[in-house]
């Protein structure tokens, strides 16, 4: 009748959560130099939904896509977005805060930056003939990435 519990449930002894384990199993993190992303949904080759988490004071490369457009929705933090039509060195910059959105058409140069000391989270909806990671053209050699 004298039973000692060795494993705690919650409280100070809680080491993990089943909801965290389930999230990692369903949508594993894909680590990148700028943070990470999770694939949230894919509806065939033409639609993909991701959540991007950009580390403080980090940025993605200046890039464009031949086969997909993107729609970004800031869910947390402040984003600085650089876009250009023809010449990626002649870009315009806008700031987006929580619940702001931007559409990035096919063939538009774009760069997502987090110039703050807080995490940035963006929901990205890709739409096009083929939403694959290989559909990316980076501008020049980015010293941040070394490629």
Where would I find each of the regions flagged by the language model?
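Structural motif
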Residues: 59, 71, 78-80, 101, ...
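Short acidic-glycine-tyrosine-enriched beta hairpin
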Residues: 83-109
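Classical nucleotidyltransferase
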Residues: 1-32
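Short hydrophobic/aromatic-rich beta-strand segments that constitute the beta-sheet cores
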Residues: 61-62, 81-83, 124
